């Protein structure tokens, strides 16, 4: 049997040489879809419904809901609850995120369930005595947690757009928590690498994820009895159990005992918000993504508007000229991000100006295909924050054509590492996504301005970008990714790879990626690009830095006949796309 790693190399080499494997050329699919690990350049295929997520067990939960007659929203909520059990690195009840929904009728809406700063939060709460940001406070203390939004967001989506009752879609997650599941490679590796930094510091957490003084290993069974009880209460009593009931008591008491800020009043006051998506037109395709407090949608559309002024297809995938143009466009977008983006309920975000094609043309006119502009010479445009890599994204499409893209997170891996009392629920460290000191880069190098300063009841800025692309009025691509500041450029490349270069969803997923975020002034690249191309980029003035893999897209493409083509990212272990 040919090893998957060899197939990956073949696929990447083929992409770099200009070869293109079309979805139509794929061999006949077996009755049940298979994981992309088995074949990296042919998508998974299905006719009725499809789920792509970072965890195989959660994916199967979603497929089962679809088979039982649930729609894409029902399946998405079920997957979200399942990931809170099987992928505690980022799947959560104690965090937040965004959901993008496109109905079979063509209506598109966004659900914002981003965490909110507690009412007692203050602008300078994460500064030390010298006025400098203290990352321990904003990452690992009880002060680091914002009021969670996941449970409220899932219920808002399910009540308005789903067809199944809450207890039905929570049931699979409850069983997984109660009965346990086998720890896979991904969870075992993350417990050892990242969990060891935060989980053993808290007895509640250690009792769940540690055994005999060590983190659980691959093959161990992880049972989460307290989390099962919390899920059972949510299933029976709805989101009020989390925000006003026993679970709220557990969270508030955990905070009160340990110097945190979240109160019962903060929890009771939390509301998920339905917002109008950001949208733009790119070469005849309509691109929908998240509005603020996500910066993702605005800047994906902004960069696409800039690229529309160039013949990207002519330059070709992986060429120095194409990468130069995209990197320069990204610099301008990230510079604007630092200045203008924040919670739209608190600051006026000039999204219409930022996504205006005339503004994009003015930026395109400044891009020199032969010479990189130093970031120090770029300032936010004249118009008429730290994010973790351990977010998770999943995509769902059902038999009727409803589509859902969800990106949610605890922020860093396992969040604060703190489990609230006996709830079994890990708490986020999302407060670190605010600009603790405007103008000072966070751990990811992202610079934030006053618009994203800490404030009571405010939602921190995010790059999470669940995205749906429409062709001829029909859903064409559902995608998204984790990756912190690199989410925007990862999703951008999925769109450009698919539209401009004609890659199928598996090829677009497997193609090597690159990223520029203005500051630091470096062009970050994955392995897989031609050394000659990188030398040409350096000759153009780019500061090329070879770094580890970025992103983990989970994507579904819809063919003209309605057939579904999906791909999970081989950069992640144990993810799965499946359908029926």
From Swiss-Prot:
Q: Keyword NAD, does the record have it?
A: no
Name the PROSITE patterns for this protein: G_GLU_TRANSPEPTIDASE
The knockout outcome noted for this protein's gene is: Loss of growth using exogenous gamma-glutamyl peptides as amino acid sources.
Q: Which reaction does it catalyse?
A: an N-terminal (5-L-glutamyl)-[peptide] + an alpha-amino acid = 5-L-glutamyl amino acid + an N-terminal L-alpha-aminoacyl-[peptide]; glutathione + H2O = L-cysteinylglycine + L-glutamate; an S-substituted glutathione + H2O = an S-substituted L-cysteinylglycine + L-glutamate
Q: Name one Pfam family in it.
A: G_glu_transpept
Q: How is it modified after translation?
A: Cleaved by autocatalysis into a large and a small subunit.
EC identifiers of the protein:
3.4.19.13, 2.3.2.2
Q: What name does the UniProt record give this protein?
A: Glutathione hydrolase proenzyme
């Amino acid at each position: 049997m040919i090893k998957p790693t060899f197939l990956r190399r073949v696929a990447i080499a083929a992409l770099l040489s200009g070869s293109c494997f079309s979805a139509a050329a794929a061999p006949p699919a077996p009755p049940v879809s298979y994981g992309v690990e088995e074949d990296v350049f042919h998508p998974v295929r299905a006719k009725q419904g499809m789920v792509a997520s970072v965890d195989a067990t959660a994916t199967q939960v979603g497929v089962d809901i679809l088979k039982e007659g649930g729609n894409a929203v029902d399946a998405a909520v079920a997957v979200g609850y399942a990931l809170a059990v099987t992928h505690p690195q980022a799947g959560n009840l104690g965090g937040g995120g965004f959901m993008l929904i496109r109905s079979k009728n063509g209506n598109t809406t966004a659900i914002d369930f981003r965490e909110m700063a507690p009412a007692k939060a203050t602008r300078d709460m994460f500064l030390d005595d010298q006025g400098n940001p203290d990352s321990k406070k904003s990452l690992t203390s009880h002060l680091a947690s914002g009021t969670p939004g996941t449970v409220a967001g899932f219920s808002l989506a399910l009540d308005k757009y789903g067809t199944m009752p809450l207890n039905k879609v929570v049931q699979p997650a409850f069983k997984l928590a109660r009965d346990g599941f086998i720890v896979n490679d991904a969870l075992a590796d993350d417990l050892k690498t990242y969990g060891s930094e935060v989980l053993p510091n808290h007895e509640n957490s250690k009792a769940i994820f540690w055994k005999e003084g060590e983190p659980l290993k691959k093959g161990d069974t992880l049972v989460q009895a307290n989390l099962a009880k919390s899920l059972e209460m949510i299933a029976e009593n709805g989101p009020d159990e989390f925000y006003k009931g026993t679970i709220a008591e557990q969270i508030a008491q955990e905070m009160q005992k340990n110097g945190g800020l979240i109160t019962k009043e903060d929890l009771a006051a939390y509301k998920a918000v339905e917002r109008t998506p950001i949208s733009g037109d790119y070469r005849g395709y309509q691109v929908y993504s998240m509005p603020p407090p996500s910066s993702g949608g605005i800047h994906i559309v902004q960069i696409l508007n800039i690229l529309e002024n160039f013949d990207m297809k002519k330059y070709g995938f992986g060429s120095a000229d194409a990468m130069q143009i995209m990197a320069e466009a990204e610099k301008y977008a990230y510079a604007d991000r630092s200045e203008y983006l924040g919670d739209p309920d608190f600051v006026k975000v000039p999204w219409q100006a930022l996504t205006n094609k005339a503004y994009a043309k003015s930026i395109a006119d400044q891009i020199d295909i032969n010479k990189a502009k130093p970031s120090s010479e770029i300032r936010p445009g004249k118009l008429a924050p730290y994010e973790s890599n351990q977010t998770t994204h999943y995509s769902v499409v059902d038999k009727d054509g409803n589509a859902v893209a969800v990106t949610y997170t605890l922020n860093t891996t396992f969040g604060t590492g703190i489990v609230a009392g006996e709830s079994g629920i890990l708490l986020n460290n999302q407060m670190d996504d605010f600009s603790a000191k405007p103008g000072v880069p966070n751990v990811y190098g992202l610079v934030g301005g006053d618009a994203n300063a800490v404030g009571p009841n405010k939602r921190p800025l995010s790059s999470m970008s669940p995205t749906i692309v429409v062709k001829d009025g029909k859903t064409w691509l559902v995608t998204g990714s984790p990756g912190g500041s690199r989410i925007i450029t990862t999703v951008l490349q999925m769109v450009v790879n698919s539209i401009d270069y004609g890659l199928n969803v598996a090829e677009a997923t497997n193609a090597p990626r690159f990223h520029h975020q203005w500051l630091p002034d470096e062009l970050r690249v994955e392995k897989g690009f031609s050394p000659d191309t990188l030398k040409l980029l350096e000759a153009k003035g780019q500061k090329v830095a070879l770094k580890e893999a970025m992103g983990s897209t989970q994507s579904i493409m819809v063919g003209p006949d309605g057939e579904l083509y999906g791909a999970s990212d081989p950069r992640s272990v144990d993810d799965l796309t499946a359908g029926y």
